[in-house]
């Protein structure tokens, strides 16, 4: 168990991370640097796992950052130990498969929503699907996640009352 401060990086671009992380308390965001701008592509909350996809699946350096947005309580497991558990324990292997399926579906839904919904509809879905997160996360990160500017998000918020 690790108690880690806000702004601590669990993974960084170019670093081969050797752990997967479980968030007991706190939240994180995963982001990329694109043309010098931070683009948030994921939030992880209590009960979620987070990790560098490249490190977990290919044992290569990561292409994204995972930053804690709050003081957090994190458990870590070395990736080789996790892989051994998958190989030797069918219940854990199935649990891991289900987690990965859920994440894949969330990612696919997000991509489809970015392509097919208006900015207002994306924001409304985000609020209803992530109650309370708006009070925990910087609005700029949410705007980036939803594929809009912070100014556009602020204008939408002024027009919408939940």
Predicted regions located by residue number:
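Short beta-strand segments in beta-sandwich/barrel cores
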Residues: 27-32, 48-49, 73-74
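Ligand-binding loop in jelly-roll beta-barrel domains
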Residues: 38, 57-80, 91
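Phosphate-/nucleic-acid-contacting segments
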Residues: 117-162
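Histidine-centered metal-chelating micro-motifs
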Residues: 9, 29, 50-52, 61-64, ...
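Regulatory nucleotide-sensing modules
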Residues: 1-21, 25
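A small-molecule sensor/coupling module
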Residues: 62, 81-118, 122
